Amino acid sequence: MQVILLDKIAHLGNVGDQVSVKAGFARNFLIPQGKAVMATQANIEYFESRRAELERKAAEVLATAQARANQLAELATVTITSKAGDEGRLFGSITARDVAEAVTAAGVEIAKSEVRLSTGPLRTTGEHQVRFQLHGEVFATLNVVIVAE
């Protein structure tokens, strides 16, 4: 199935590229999320007339993500308190939602879907490196310190 991309998609293409994808991927993901449209003749002509506007919009989204990454870099560390045992193991765990709430409370708006916990939920006290994917190509890291209550 031929689609025209309205957003940059990793391993697929950039804004305006006409690519061939499987029908299910287009119908169930790309088109409902507003990341692509079917490559009909009418859509191709319409897209060509709006190409500059869509590219400008994509550049604004990228600039916003980079600004948020700079804010995260300035933040340096975020501290989260949680109940823990004597050996430093938490009663429960710190999830992506908890990290997102702590960073948002510190002044940088982050959604839980942007938090990347590579080893799963954090289960021990101490300092942990947390990675954030703010855009398809904008990443940031932040030290999260977990202290016992």
From Swiss-Prot:
GO cellular component, as recorded: ribonucleoprotein complex; ribosome
Keywords from the UniProt entry: Ribonucleoprotein, Ribosomal protein, RNA-binding, rRNA-binding
Coiled-coil features, chain-numbered ranges: none
Keyword Protease: no
Superkingdom: Bacteria
Pfam families: Ribosomal_L9_C, Ribosomal_L9_N
Record GO terms (molecular function): rRNA binding; structural constituent of ribosome
Stored PANTHER family: 50S RIBOSOMAL PROTEIN L9 (PTHR21368)
Purpose of the protein: Binds to the 23S rRNA.
Family listed: Belongs to the bacterial ribosomal protein bL9 family.
Protein name, UniProt field: Large ribosomal subunit protein bL9
Species name: Histophilus somni (strain 2336)
Species classification: Bacteria, Pseudomonadati, Pseudomonadota, Gammaproteobacteria, Pasteurellales
Name of the gene encoding the protein in the UniProt record: rplI
